């Protein structure tokens, strides 16, 4: 029988990575990252990537697998994650941890994802037409997809049209779910709003003390300020500071604010899944509680 996949999810700064490491040590397991920015090399401090020592302690997968100038599609991530899970699931219970909802959903739900690689030339042509025109076009060629995509969401609109023009079939007809053939135990970490905000504040200060500004400066020097990843959370604010547009104090305040907003969106996403077992991130015996849940669920799996 295949061992269960253990999933740890929840809002940013809730302590997911720390719990995953502690649990991996206890279960003698491995960790698979489900973070859309930790896949990129050189983006370390601002993505809260596990330290070198932590990665030596426990094998981590799907970290540092792409150059900052490359892109990783959801389909590519899903394929890599599933390969790792299947290669270990007969020996240990792999731990999938992260806050990127779509990465987790692609694995847990077995999302069917069209295998269409990005088409830069087609995307440029579509972008030039304007979002209003594109959305109306999508409504005609794939009304089902258009109902699921916000009229202002240009990225998803263009992706849907891209799949349609490359395959000749609506993206909605190529989607769906193919649930995995192994059991899954989903664990959610969260805490009271004020407590999470304090965690976010502390982590932001720790990132700056650890050299976040210097990391951003090196990345700008090497790749230029127009690198898309430099417009993401934590990096965009420090880029503004380095450009002299805001003070370091303002950059820190903005990072905290934007991280709080991001955490709120993550909480909304994950709370929609009733199969997730939620735990208080500040619980004094968190590791023991989670371990007991896993043991109880494994007993149920064996009995069935």
Swiss-Prot record:
Q: What cofactors does the UniProt entry give for this protein?
A: Mg(2+)
Keywords in alphabetical order, please: ATP-binding, Magnesium, Nucleotide-binding, Transferase, tRNA processing
Chain positions covered by the region annotation Interaction with substrate tRNA: 35-38
Question: At the top level of its lineage, which domain of life is listed?
Answer: Bacteria
- Tell me yes or no: is Zinc among this UniProt entry's keywords: no
InterPro entries attached here?
Dimethylallyltransferase (IPR039657), IPT (IPR018022), P-loop_NTPase (IPR027417)
Provide the residue positions that the database annotates as binding ATP. 10-17
Give the EC class as a word.
Answer: transferase
Q: Which parts of the sequence are marked as the site Interaction with substrate tRNA?
A: 100
Q: Record keywords: tRNA processing included?
A: yes
Residues noted as binding substrate in the record, renumbered to the chain? 12-17
User: Pfam families, from UniProt?
Assistant: IPPT
One of its GO biological process terms is:
tRNA modification
Q: Which reaction does it catalyse?
A: adenosine(37) in tRNA + dimethylallyl diphosphate = N(6)-dimethylallyladenosine(37) in tRNA + diphosphate
Give the Enzyme Commission number: 2.5.1.75
Gene Ontology molecular function terms on file: ATP binding; tRNA dimethylallyltransferase activity
Q: Which family does the record assign?
A: Belongs to the IPP transferase family.
The family database entries (HAMAP family) matched by this protein are listed as: IPP_trans
What is the protein's known function?
Catalyzes the transfer of a dimethylallyl group onto the adenine at position 37 in tRNAs that read codons beginning with uridine, leading to the formation of N6-(dimethylallyl)adenosine (i(6)A).
The entry describes its oligomerization and partners as:
Monomer.
Its recorded name reads tRNA dimethylallyltransferase
Native species of this protein?
Gloeothece citriformis (strain PCC 7424) (Cyanothece sp. (strain PCC 7424))
